[in-house]
Structures are given as C-alpha cells and as structure tokens.
Curated annotation (Swiss-Prot):
Reactions listed under catalytic activity: a primary alcohol + NAD(+) = an aldehyde + NADH + H(+); a secondary alcohol + NAD(+) = a ketone + NADH + H(+)
Family of the protein in this entry: Belongs to the zinc-containing alcohol dehydrogenase family.
Gene of this entry: adh1
Binding site for Zn(2+) 2: 98, 101, 104, 112
Swiss-Prot/TrEMBL cofactor(s): Zn(2+)
EC number: 1.1.1.1
GO annotations of cellular component type: cytoplasm
Cystine pairs: none
Note describing how the cofactor binds: Binds 2 Zn(2+) ions per subunit.
UniProt-recorded name of the protein: Alcohol dehydrogenase 1
Length: 350
C-alpha cells in the first residue's frame, strides 16, 4: 500500500490558534503502533479546549487535534499482532498507556499517569494519516460505516461509561444535561438501549425535536423554564427526582443544580468539562439524602469494545453532519455559539 511522504492537516501552531490547513510529514509508526489512513474524524468540544489551551493540563504545541478518527490500517510496527494491513481501526482520546501501573492493571487505563492523549499530548486525527498504540486502538467491523462510527469512538464510549458509573438500572430514570448535543444524543440512545428512562435537559426547539425523536420521555428547556429543579423532578416517577444525573454541559451552572433534583441515594456523574468550573452541592442534603457525586472519564479498552458493539448491532445511531476537513474553523465557531445539534464529522481527503 503506497504511503505518501506528505499529507494535509489542520495545525494549531500556538494556543488559541488560528488553525492552519497545510501539508506536514506523514508520521511513521513505532514498533507497537499502527498508522491509520483516516477517512473520518468526529469533532468534540475537547478539541476546542485543546486549541484554546484552557484546561489545567499541558497541551502539545504545535498540535494536530482530533481524537475520533476512523480509517484503515496502512502500516504497523514489528510488535503489532492485533491488526493486519487493511483492517478498519478507530483512534480514540486515549492513544496509549503504560499497561504496567496500578491503574492500568485494574482496567483504569485512562487514569494512567503516563497516558498519551490523541489531539492533546500527541497529534490526533485532523490529518490524513495518524498514529496510535495498537493495544488501545479499536478494531472496527468492516460492515460498520466509518463516518457514522467516528463519534462513538469518544462521545459514545464516554457516555456509555458514564451510565455504567451511575449505577442506574433498567426501569429507572436518568436526567441527561446537554441531551441535545453530541454526547447527549448518544447518551440518550445508550440509556434507552439499556432499558433506562430519560429526562432530557437542553435548550431550544431543534434539540427538543431530536431528543423526543430519540426516545426521551420528557424534555426540560432550560431557556424557558421558570424553575428547572421543580420541572425535572415533576418529570420523574412520583416526583422524587432522577435516579442518576449525567452532566454533559459545557457551562458551569448545571453543575451547581444537579444535586437538587437527583433522587435520594441517587448519583450525579460529571462528564462535561467547562473550563474553570466547580461542582456545588449542599453538604446537609448530600449527607442525609445519601447522594453520590462522582466523575467519569472516557472509558477503558473493554468499554470501547462494548460501546462499538452497541453501534454495530444497530442500537445506536449517532446524529451527525459531515463537512470537509477544511471547514474545521467554522465548526468551532458554531460550537462556541452552541448551534450544533448532534455531532459534526469531518471527511478527510483521500
């Protein structure tokens, strides 16, 4: 398979951008790595944070962002046994980990202190050819469309793991904050596929229509409600609140409200990462109502296998729009304005 020396990529040369669409060298895989010809890459809010450099985590510069890449393996290192040339592969946020520390040994690879992160600490998938550790790349069934599966590689795995972390069971109710966004639209579907009832929280009629079409039993519009806490509780059985809350918002305020409408002995799971934000919960109520508050961060390798399997079996359809790689700056503008329903997937040029 012919591999060129140069390729097109979206490159940030300094924090805050601008993005420059230019040619850069094609990387060569190490002994335990694969080189993937990226056909599609989802766009995640994390990519915008990476560009801005506004998280308390050092970001590589210059940087090729992106961490939801789906494509074809075109080269592999001598030690790679998991992939053959021509296999379909997904490159995710967790590009690699040491596999030897306490966290890796107990299947918490995302917590590895030496983890490498696609599109953040190593170059990601907003380029024609990208590198990933073979042990962490996802093998994709060849009958699965690469454009449609791209958002599952981060958004899907992340929300699937969050639902597992919440402990919510079939027949119980989960409130999903940010249900009309890229993560939320997937969380809603995973929840429905797991037999969980959903109260969707977001803003706007377009997002309401999408959430209802995906199976939400109730929709609370934060731009219209006079009392969000009361409205969410009223939408749950017996008005007692949701058994779990999945926080996918990119603003701080929802993180201050969730403990007020979660059910006693319920669980609040923080997944969204608004820059500089803090969680807030009344200590008295948290104690006497036995509320659990926890974070959930992407997923391990097995979570990835399971999340992709839901998709491969037709249980999940990621709402997405396609755009060329050159349009990434415009997509970031729409993202900052909160005007994206579902997910954007970039088509990477051949």
């Amino acid at each position: 398979m012919s591999i060129p020396e140069m390729q097109w990529a979206q490159v940030a040369e300094q924090k805050g951008g601008p993005l420059i669409y230019k040619q850069i060298p094609v990387p060569k895989p190490g002994p335990d790595e694969i080189l993937v010809k990226v056909r599609y890459s989802g766009v995640c809010h994390t990519d915008l944070h990476a560009l801005k450099g506004d998280w308390p985590l050092p970001v590589k510069m210059p940087l090729v962002g992106g961490h939801e890449g789906a494509g074809v393996v075109v080269a592999r290192g001598d030690l790679v046994t998991e992939f053959e040339i021509g296999d379909h592969a997904g490159l995710k946020w967790l590009n690699g980990s040491c596999l030897a520390c306490e966290f890796c040994k107990q299947a918490d690879e995302p917590l590895c202190p030496n983890a490498s992160l696609s599109g953040y600490t190593v170059d990601g998938t907003f380029q024609q050819y990208a590198i990933g550790k073979a042990t962490h790349a996802s093998k994709l069934p060849k009958n699965v469309p690469l454009d449609a599966v791209a958002p599952v590689l981060c958004a899907g795995i992340t929300v699937y793991k969050g639902l597992k972390e919440s402990g919510v069971r079939p027949g119980q109710t989960v409130a999903i904050v940010g249900a009309g966004g890229g993560l939320g639209s997937l969380a809603l579907q995973y929840a429905k596929a797991m037999g969980i009832r959903v109260v969707a929280i977001d803003g706007g009629e377009e997002k309401q229509a999408m959430c209802e079409q995906l199976g939400a039993e109730a929709y609370v519009d934060f731009t219209k409600t006079q009392d969000l806490v009361a409205d969410v509780k009223a939408a749950t059985p017996e008005g007692l609140g949701a058994h779990a809350v999945i926080l996918l918002a990119v603003a701080e305020k929802p993180f201050q409200q969730a403990a007020e409408y979660v059910r006693s002995r319920g669980t609040v799971v923080a997944i969204g990462l608004p820059a500089g934000a803090f969680l807030r919960a009344p200590v008295f109520n948290t104690v006497v109502r036995m509320i659990n508050i926890k974070g959930s961060y992407v997923g391990n390798r097995q979570d990835g296998v399971e999340a992709v399997d839901f998709f491969a079996r037709g249980l999940i359809k990621a709402p997405f729009k396609t755009a060329p790689l050159q349009d990434l700056p415009k997509i970031f503008e729409l993202m900052e304005q909160g005007k994206i329903a579902g997910r954007y997937v970039l088509e990477i040029p051949e």
